[in-house]
């Protein structure tokens, strides 16, 4: 049994409340949790962006706007926990320490944002360190890491494997797939480098792709690792 930390983008799980993918993700998360310890960090998605946009129009400062966004991530996390039922720990973890403690239950642990100015990708990267994860997975809207935005550059190169240093180089150039806010931010990339925990980046718009990649090694994805040790399937 391995420990897996998932950064599940809000734009993937709940792009819009009426167009959420929660039902489709339930059997996928349960299948993975049947074989491994699973921690999920949920992003804010369209809901968080909408609230933050309104807050800015009202002249609310950035720190408070971030706190509003964090509340939305926790609301999304609460919805996922309720939908998972007995498979999940019944409370949203509000710190890395809480998440680690809740993990002792062997149930799926779900959390949202923690600190203003920090993305849920960064939260997940630190959580991976705290729980000594075997793999950190970023579930996003593209099938891995590219040297340029593949949506605007058809000839962009997909990286099946790369080192943490190569990842940082791409992030610092602003060339991560659909945009660093959708694939990985630079803080999370730095944490990946220091932790030496393998990172997997995959497309989560088709939920079953997550279990296919992690449990069966099927599909297209990117692996960031400081060693040549085989990461997938788990």
From Swiss-Prot:
GO terms for biological process: 'de novo' CTP biosynthetic process; UDP biosynthetic process. Its EC number is 2.7.4.22. This is Uridylate kinase. It catalyses: UMP + ATP = UDP + ADP. Inhibited by UTP. GO terms for cellular component: cytoplasm. Catalyzes the reversible phosphorylation of UMP to UDP. It is an enzyme of class 2 (transferase). The gene is pyrH. GO terms for molecular function: ATP binding; UMP kinase activity. Keywords: ATP-binding, Cytoplasm, Kinase, Nucleotide-binding, Pyrimidine biosynthesis, Transferase. Belongs to the UMP kinase family. Pathway: Pyrimidine metabolism; CTP biosynthesis via de novo pathway; UDP from UMP (UMPK route): step 1/1. It is found in: Cytoplasm. Homohexamer. NCBIfam families: pyrH_arch. UMP binds at residues 44, 66, 114-120. ATP binds at residues 10-11, 45, 49, 140, 146, 149.
């Amino acid at each position: 049994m391995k420990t897996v930390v998932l950064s599940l983008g809000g734009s993937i799980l709940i792009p819009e409340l009426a167009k959420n993918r929660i039902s489709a993700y339930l059997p996928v998360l349960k299948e993975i949790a049947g074989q491994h310890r699973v921690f999920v960090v949920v992003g804010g998605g369209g809901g968080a962006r909408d609230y933050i946009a309104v807050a800015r129009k009202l002249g609310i400062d950035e720190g408070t706007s971030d706190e509003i966004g964090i509340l939305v991530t926790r609301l999304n996390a609460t919805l996922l926990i309720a939908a998972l039922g007995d498979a999940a720990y019944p409370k949203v973890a509000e710190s890395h320490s809480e998440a680690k403690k809740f993990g002792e239950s062997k149930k799926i642990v779900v959390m949202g944002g923690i600190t203003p100015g920090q993305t849920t990708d960064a939260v997940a990267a630190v959580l991976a360190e705290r729980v000594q994860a075997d793999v950190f997975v970023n579930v996003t809207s593209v099938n891995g890491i590219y040297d340029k935005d593949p949506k605007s550059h058809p000839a962009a190169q997909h990286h099946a494997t790369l080192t943490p240093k190569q990842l940082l180089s791409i992030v610092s150039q602003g060339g991560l797939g659909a945009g660093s806010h959708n694939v990985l931010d630079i803080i999370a990339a730095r944490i990946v480098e220091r932790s030496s925990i393998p990172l997997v980046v995959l497309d989560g718009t088709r939920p079953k792709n997550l279990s296919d990649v992690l449990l069966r090694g099927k599909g297209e994805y990117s692996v960031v690792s400081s060693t040549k040790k085989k990461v997938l399937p788990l």
